A protein has these predicted regions:
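Short, charged/polar, Gly/Pro-enriched secondary-structure boundary elements
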Residues: 45-52, 159-162, 376-378
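C-terminal catalytic and target-recognition region of SAM-dependent MTase-like enzymes
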Residues: 288-398
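Conserved S-adenosyl-L-methionine
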Residues: 175-293, 308-309, 313-317
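SAM-dependent Rossmann-like transferase core, predominantly class I methyltransferases
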Residues: 152-186
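C-terminal edge-of-domain segments
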Residues: 141-157, 368
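Non-catalytic nucleic-acid substrate-recognition regions in nucleic-acid-modifying enzymes
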Residues: 2-137, 398-399
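A short, flexible beta-alpha/helix-coil linker loop
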Residues: 101-104, 160, 305-309
Length: 399
């Protein structure tokens, strides 16, 4: 078995730069950035460190082979060539999942069956047995076929890394934790930041911002698939957990305030903050956005209700308009609003300094970024429909 592995960390589009910084910070080597994924190198300790510490990626996978596969024979041979006996014990359970895109082999179930057969044959030959009970630890095998090139991977994470362990329940259409962590990074949240959210929902944006400010590792409250893998010793997990705990900075000046008109959401946000260990830094209250007055030094991170969280588009537009009016009267250090509403700037009443295309799960969104802008006259002028090309023609009058 090699001393170092090639690892893959998929992430949502728009999160790659933040994820690269995180990987550099934990000592990953040979980091390469692609669309929606990063590859890097590291030993067994890196598998533990990456799963425990990465905030913005979806999972960590061990890349076992990359090879051309236009036929089932080629698919089988590429899988059989992997030294599975060094990774999987004789009693391992090994489900196979994957996808195929723009490839000759289009049937995912058929590919799953071929890959499973190849692993079974290799393990039987190398373990000198005719029986594989699959009663032991689960090793999830994943494959990806793209343009007749196959990647075979072993999942080290289990449930996605957005499952932090603190959000037991959520309101409708919550923001994904990994995306919230990326927004906190783009918003330049620091140890002494003051952060506010007028549409806090179940509190995810502020909780992720607090954990970032306090350097609380996101994976401390959960378990990972690779904790049962024989080639990642339990001692490494214990060491990495202890290291993460030691690097936490609980005594910081960070403070966050979240508001929502729904008392149930506020109660849930408070419960989630307590589970996340940031209840002393995050404060949630019932309040209407019409009463929101951002503090001058505040960074506002928010996910305005839209789509599943609103019954009508008109209702969402009205809330965005109200937010714009309140922000015009109470300017702050910056506003970072993530929404699927492509007309947000028109409703809000001001063009963003910068926009970034992102995804909340499978929902395409835009992050609208406003930095230290002067007061402006709020007039919700109509704007032309626009895609992601960044072209805009409407100007808003400034005072």
């Amino acid at each position: 078995m090699p001393a170092k592995f090639e690892l893959i960390a998929p992430c949502f589009f728009g999160c790659e730069a933040t994820a690269k910084f995180e990987l550099t910070r934990i000592g990953a080597e040979n980091i390469r950035v692609g669309d929606g994924r990063l590859t890097f190198a590291g030993g067994p300790e890196m598998i533990a460190a990456a799963n425990l510490n990465l905030r913005t990626v979806e999972r960590v996978m061990l890349l076992l082979n990359t090879y051309p596969a236009s036929t089932f024979d080629e698919l089988f041979d590429g899988v059989y060539s992997i030294p599975w006996e060094e990774l999987l014990p004789a009693d391992a359970a090994f489900p196979v999942t994957g996808s195929s895109l723009n490839s000759q082999l289009t049937s995912v179930p058929a590919c799953q069956s071929i890959i499973k057969k190849a692993v079974v044959k290799r393990l039987m030959n190398k373990h000198h047995t005719f029986v594989l009970p699959e009663t032991g630890a689960e090793y999830k095998i994943r494959f990806m076929l793209r343009k007749n090139v196959c990647e075979i991977m072993l999942d080290t994470t289990g449930e996605g890394l957005h499952k932090r362990g603190y959000r037991r329940n959520a309101m409708e259409a919550p923001i994904r934790e990994t995306l919230a962590a990326t927004i906190a990074d783009l918003g330049r949240v620091r140890r002494d930041s003051l952060v506010e959210d007028p549409f806090c929902g179940s509190g995810t944006l502020l909780i992720e911002a607090a954990q970032k400010a306090m350097n609380i590792a996101p994976g401390l409250k959960r378990r990972f698939a690779a904790e049962r893998y024989s080639f990642v010793p339990a001692s490494l997990w214990a060491e990495q957990r202890q290291k993460a705990l030691a690097e936490s900075k609980l005594d910081v000046g960070f403070e966050a305030f979240g508001y929502d008109i729904d008392p149930a959401a506020v109660a849930l946000a408070n419960a989630n903050a307590k589970l996340a260990g940031v209840e002393k830094r995050c404060h949630f209250e019932v309040a209407d956005v019409a009463d929101f007055a951002a503090k001058p030094e505040a960074i506002v991170l928010t996910n305005p209700p839209y789509g599943e969280r609103m019954n009508t588009i008109e209702g969402a537009a009205k809330l965005a308009r109200t937010l714009g009016q309140q922000m015009a009267e109470h300017p702050c250090a910056g506003l970072y609003a993530i929404t699927a509403d492509m007309e947000f700037e028109s409703h809000y009443g001001k063009r963003a300094n910068k926009r970034r295309k992102m995804y909340n799960g499978m929902i395409p969104c835009q992050l609208y970024m406003y930095y230290e802008a002067p007061k402006f006259e709020h007039k919700a002028k109509p704007m032309p429909k626009q895609g992601f090309d960044g072209k805009r023609t409407v100007e808003f009058k400034k005072k």
